[in-house]
């Protein structure tokens, strides 16, 4: 089932679809941190930065609903849950790398101006 925000964006243009899927708080940082492979919730939270467990959970659920992230629950005691990029999610790697480079360039230019 497609989320309402994505359905609405589909009526506008592809850029709006990308923003609807990836524009949430911390979503691109989550994707960036899953590029290296599967990760458990706690570790992902530490890698992402100052994000609350509630927000991280919500963003992971939306990314899962949009087919970008998969969630695997292992039948172990204690339970183990891992998140990883789906095949579709992996297609974001070049875009995320480009945005990461752009962000670093932008940040250095702001620093130079101050």
Regions found by a protein language model. Name each.
Residues 1-3, 10, 14, 32, ...:
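Amphipathic alpha-helical dimerization/coiled-coil segments
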Residues 5, 60, 83-85:
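Intrinsic disorder/low-complexity segments enriched in polar/small residues
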Residues 6-55, 76-77, 82, 90, ...:
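N-terminal helix-turn-helix DNA-binding core of bacterial DNA-binding proteins
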Residues 27, 39, 65-68, 101-104, ...:
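Generic structural signal for secondary-structure transition and capping sites
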Residues 28-29, 42, 58, 72, ...:
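Basic, gly/Ser/Thr/Pro-rich low-complexity segments located predominantly at protein N termini
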Residues 56, 60-66:
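Basic amphipathic alpha-helical segments that dock to polyanions
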């Amino acid at each position: 089932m497609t989320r309402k925000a994505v359905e609405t964006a589909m009526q506008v243009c592809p850029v709006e679809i990308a923003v609807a899927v990836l524009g949430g708080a911390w979503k691109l940082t989550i994707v960036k941190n899953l590029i290296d492979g599967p990760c458990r919730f706690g570790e992902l939270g530490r890698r992402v930065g100052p994000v609350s467990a509630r927000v991280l959970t919500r963003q992971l659920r939306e990314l899962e609903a949009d087919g970008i992230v998969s969630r695997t629950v292992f039948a172990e005691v204690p339970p183990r849950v891992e998140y990883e990029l789906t095949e579709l999610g992996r297609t974001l790697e070049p875009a995320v790398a480009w945005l990461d480079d752009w962000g670093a360039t932008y940040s250095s230019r702001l620093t130079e101006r101050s």
